[in-house]
């Protein structure tokens, strides 16, 4: 067998060639099995949503469900007073499948329904596993599936949208908390009010959290009950389609958090104990429950589960024209331990037999399927262990993700802010951390996501400014702490965003330093929405300092987008001095200069660059971003020759670099 490129590109992996080859072959064998030795495609296989669930036919309705442990199944709902009636009894087919055909007048748009499933030792109501619309009764709080066949369904206008990935600039969003008011926001409000803000801010991709239906709003959408249903608390499927269509019309791609790492325990709303069999969709024994998440773990070794999850991927791509996925909780899927209590300090930790090869196989085939359905689709892995090959091509021995989240970066910034005084911040450590990635993988860099904003944690700006955010964000009343916080907020984001090799992510509102944590309505806070919203009025108020950070973020992204193929350009460190706290690096004709020193500004600070004339094109200290304006950005900077460096074709560039300032210069000739 020819050596896979994953191993060729990293000699340290040669010792684990058997494990790597074994996983690669496992995926190939499983694909062959699922596609009947290639007689159909993986996309052909992943069409369960067209077979199972409720569908209109030319003569009426057909409904199917997979429930091998069931002895009887009845369709019950508003159309038959929620009672078991013979005419609504399903017929058992082969392979544990059940089916019923109904006349046209048996159901209508808006009807609520469930399954009453009987098994040998009992019975219970269940929402169908393949339900595409699930709603909650406002009075009883009971969830039910809903017949959704509107007379004039929304028709997507744009069938062939191509995401911009040069670079990929992601705005992470939660529809429910995207509005100013203390309530659950809607798809319609997001389209009308939030989407224009994202366009103005300069992001080219929206990542939606919490789209799959989930009973508990406070779970942030990570305890999914109904995998094919778009959450009804935000509106209708048609309103979501119009939102996605509108985003595409504005040049913005839309991806979603897809949760295939676990499922909610709920039996009536979810898949738990679906037909009296707790293991129908989930691992048996000690691997059944997730020890940290109070949820159930899918059995990726079952072909029926593989069919369910792969079909789920294709459904969202086809039905809603989504542009891809961020796969949630990938670390939990990869390891029997779910990554809990693991250090991952050595390559052997990835190949010691403690990995779930079935889950690895599923992720590999999921990536292959997504790109088979849409070659331009985007897949991102949320993975913290550093598993080699995660974002490497499948044919090279990898698992096929386009990107992996650079989860080390936010952890580094939090540790830097909380554990070190300003004088001890080391630029060499910063540069190493933001560029610490495998050469064969693209990453999504970010300073903070929703994780850092959750209750009990703090955003970067809140760690920097803390209580002064309540009292000194008015222009003219800024304290030293506020000036420091705003300066470092801009510098941290500039350093992170300009060292990307794939993409950059920001959670909504953090670009302008949104205050406080996120706390969803719960008993402990009196079911309040006060901290489950976005205070857009803060950045809109010109009398406050928030817009400085928002304006800077927009201009930073404009700079990045204006450099052709920026994410693929080489990054060359020119200089760092941890004593001075100065860092300088170069990409193409652009020089990035940072002085993290809290007290010292440097005059005629020199470093070697390509000879020429340089102009300042972005400066964190510019007064329009809340800076002091200590330099004249209109001045052109000329390099100074030095006989010692003529052979290297380098000359000195000498600058005045104020304390706590980041500057971007461009070579003009």
Where are the language model's segments positioned?
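The feature marks proteins involved in alpha-glucan
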Residues: 1-62, 83-85, 89-172, 177-182, ...
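Aromatic- and carboxylate-lined catalytic core of secreted/periplasmic carbohydrate-active enzymes
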Residues: 367-368, 374-375, 534-573, 659-664
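C-terminal beta-strand-rich structural cap/linker in extracellular carbohydrate-active enzymes
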Residues: 109-113, 588, 633-669
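Surface-exposed beta-strand/loop patches in extracellular or lumenal glycoproteins
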Residues: 63-67, 73, 77, 597-613
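Conserved alpha/beta catalytic core and glycan-binding cleft of carbohydrate-active enzymes
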Residues: 321-323, 341-529, 561-606, 613, ...
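Substrate-binding/active-site clefts of carbohydrate-active enzymes
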Residues: 135, 153, 157-165, 170, ...
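Surface-exposed acidic, glycine/proline-enriched linker/cap segments
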Residues: 289-295, 300, 353, 628-652
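Conserved, mostly hydrophobic/aromatic
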Residues: 65, 115, 173, 198, ...
């Amino acid at each position: 067998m020819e050596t896979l490129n994953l191993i060729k590109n990293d000699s340290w992996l040669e010792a684990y060639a058997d494990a790597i080859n074994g996983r690669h072959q496992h995926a190939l064998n499983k694909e062959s099995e699922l596609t009947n030795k290639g007689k159909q495609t993986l996309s052909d296989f992943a069409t369960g949503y067209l077979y199972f669930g409720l569908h209109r036919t030319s003569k009426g309705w057909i409904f199917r469900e997979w429930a091998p442990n069931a002895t009887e199944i009845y369709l019950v709902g508003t159309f038959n007073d929620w009672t078991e009636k013979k005419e609504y009894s399903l017929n058992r087919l082969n392979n544990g499948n059940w089916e019923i055909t109904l006349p046209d007048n048996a159901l209508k748009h808006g009807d609520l329904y469930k399954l009453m499933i009987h098994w040998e030792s009992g019975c219970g109501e269940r929402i169908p596993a393949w339900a595409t619309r699930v709603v909650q009764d406002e009075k009883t709080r009971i969830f039910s599936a809903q017949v959704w066949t509107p007379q004039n369904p929304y028709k997507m206008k744009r069938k062939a949208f191509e995401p911009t990935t040069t670079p990929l600039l992601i705005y992470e969003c939660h529809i429910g908390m995207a509005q100013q008011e203390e309530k659950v926001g809607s798809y319609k409000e997001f389209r009308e009010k939030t989407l224009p803000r994202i366009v103005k801010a300069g992001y080219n991709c929206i990542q939606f959290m919490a789209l799959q239906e989930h009973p508990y709003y406070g779970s942030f959408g990570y305890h999914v009950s109904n995998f094919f249903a778009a959450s009804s608390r935000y509106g209708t499927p048609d309103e979501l389609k119009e939102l996605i269509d509108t985003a595409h019309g504005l040049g913005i791609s839309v991806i979603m958090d897809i949760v295939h790492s676990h499922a909610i325990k709920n039996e009536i709303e979810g898949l738990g104990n679906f037909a009296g069999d707790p293991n129908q969709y989930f691992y048996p024994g000690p691997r059944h429950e997730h020890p940290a998440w109070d949820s159930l773990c899918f059995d990726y070794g079952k072909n029926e589960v593989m069919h369910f999850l792969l079909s789920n991927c294709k459904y969202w791509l086809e039905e809603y024209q989504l542009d891809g996925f961020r796969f949630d909780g990938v670390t939990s899927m990869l390891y029997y331990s779910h990554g809990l209590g693991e250090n991952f300090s050595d390559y052997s930790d990835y190949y010691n037999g403690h990995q779930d090869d079935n889950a690895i196989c599923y992720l590999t085939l999921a990536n292959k399927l997504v790109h088979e359905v849409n070659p331009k689709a985007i897949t991102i892995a949320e993975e913290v262990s550093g598993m080699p090959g995660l974002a490497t091509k499948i044919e090279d021995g990898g698992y096929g993700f386009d990107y992996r989240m650079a989860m080390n970066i936010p952890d580094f910034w939090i540790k830097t802010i909380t554990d070190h005084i300003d004088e001890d911040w080391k630029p060499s450590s910063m540069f190493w951390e933001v560029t610490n990635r495998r050469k064969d993988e693209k990453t999504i860099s970010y300073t903070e996501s929703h994780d850092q904003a959750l209750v009990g944690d703090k955003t970067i700006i809140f760690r920097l400014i803390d209580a002064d955010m309540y009292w000194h964000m008015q222009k003219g009343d800024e304290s030293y702490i506020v000036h420091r916080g705003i300066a470092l907020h801009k510098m941290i984001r500039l350093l992170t965003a300009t060292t990307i090799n794939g993409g950059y992510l920001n959670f909504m509102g953090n670009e302008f330093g949104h205050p406080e944590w996120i706390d969803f309505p719960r008993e402990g806070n009196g079911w309040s929405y006060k901290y489950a919203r976005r205070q857009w009025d803060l950045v809109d108020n010109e009398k406050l300092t928030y817009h400085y950070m928002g304006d800077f973020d927009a201009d930073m992204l404009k700079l990045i987008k204006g450099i052709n193929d920026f994410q693929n350009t080489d990054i060359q460190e020119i200089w760092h001095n941890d004593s001075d706290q100065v860092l300088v690096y170069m990409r193409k004709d652009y020089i990035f200069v940072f002085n993290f020193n809290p007290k010292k500004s440097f005059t005629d600070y020199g470093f070697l660059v390509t000879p020429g004339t340089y102009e300042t094109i972005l400066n964190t200290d510019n007064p329009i971003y809340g800076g002091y304006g200590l330099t004249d950005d209109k001045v052109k900077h000329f390099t100074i020759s030095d006989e010692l460096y003529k052979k290297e074709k380098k000359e000195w560039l000498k600058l005045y670099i104020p304390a706590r300032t980041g500057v971007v210069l461009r070579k003009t000739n």
